[in-house]
């Protein structure tokens, strides 16, 4: 049976499989070092929509459609969607997945939403509550700036060192059906606040929590990082 492991982890007796995945991103992301690994690059940041929020919804639906296409699955075969975004009331997710008519668990974890959706989706499949589940997340530079910092129309100047929110979406299909990769366990992180107040340095805000979770994962599963 599934078991609690260490202080913050779970080990799956029946690990769920990563059956398919897909990624969609904007032009800037496509020009970066990971560009060739992205499935679909959208040159138009608006994706043909009238506002940033609708553009982010379009990112989600495109990523989901690609993942389903890779898996050879139809929306009717998916039991649940675990999905989230960076916006209030998860509006990008709500409007993005509406047409699929799949039961939705809306999740908000900011930059940890991807890990959060995968964790809960994996628990659901491993426990036998579903056989096919989607885990989805998205963000958009324009919509995030509008909600959290300065709307692009304001014309605020950013330092060259400023962190940029990704314009993109990722979708994962977890399944009880065997595939090339599986999730053997999860470690859930805690809120760790070192008092960083610079909204243009998101990495510094998140790094302490990330480091704490990685360290706890290694201890809970009795693993050690690879040496030089």
Question: What are these regions, as identified by a protein language model?
Answer:
Residues 1-53, 151-216, 220-224:
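Condensing-enzyme catalytic core mediating Claisen C-C bond formation in acyl metabolism
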Residues 7-12, 73-74, 96-99, 113, ...:
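Solvent-exposed alpha-helices and their adjacent loops that cap or buttress functional pockets
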Residues 18, 53-109, 227-228:
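Conserved beta-ketoacyl condensing-enzyme motif
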Residues 19, 83-84, 133-139:
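Short beta-strand segments
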Residues 34-37, 93-103, 125-127, 148-157, ...:
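A glycine- and small-aliphatic-rich helix-loop capping segment at beta-alpha/alpha-beta transitions
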Residues 56-72, 118-120, 205-221:
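Short, well-ordered amphipathic alpha-helical segments that serve as non-catalytic structural scaffolds
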Residues 90-91, 141-146, 191-195:
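Short, well-ordered, mixed-charge alpha-helical segments that flank or form enzyme active sites
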Residues 107-135, 174, 208:
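Active-site-proximal alpha-helical scaffold in enzymes
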């Amino acid at each position: 049976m599934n078991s609690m492991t260490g202080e913050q982890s779970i080990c799956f007796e029946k690990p769920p499989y990563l059956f398919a995945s897909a990624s969609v991103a904007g032009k800037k992301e496509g020009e970066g070092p990971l560009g060739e690994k992205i499935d679909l690059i959208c040159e138009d940041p608006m994706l043909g929509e009238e506002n940033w929020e609708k553009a982010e919804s379009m990112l989600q639906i495109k990523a989901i459609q690609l993942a389903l296409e890779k898996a050879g699955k139809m929306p009717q075969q998916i039991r649940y969607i675990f999905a989230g975004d960076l916006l209030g009331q998860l509006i990008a997710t709500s409007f993005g997945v509406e047409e699929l008519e799949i039961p939705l668990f809306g999740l908000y974890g900011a930059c940890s939403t991807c890990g959060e959706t995968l964790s809960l989706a994996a628990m659901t499949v491993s426990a036998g509550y579903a056989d096919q589940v989607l885990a989805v997340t998205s963000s958009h530079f324009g919509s995030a700036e509008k909600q959290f910092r300065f709307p692009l129309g304001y014309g605020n100047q950013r330092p060259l060192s400023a962190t940029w929110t990704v314009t993109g979406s990722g979708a994962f299909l977890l399944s009880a059906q065997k595939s090339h990769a599986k999730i053997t366990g999860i470690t859930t992180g805690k809120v760790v606040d070192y008092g960083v107040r610079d909204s243009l340095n998101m990495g510094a805000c998140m790094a302490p929590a990330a480091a704490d979770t990685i360290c706890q994962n290694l201890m809970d599963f009795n693993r050690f990082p690879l040496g030089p």
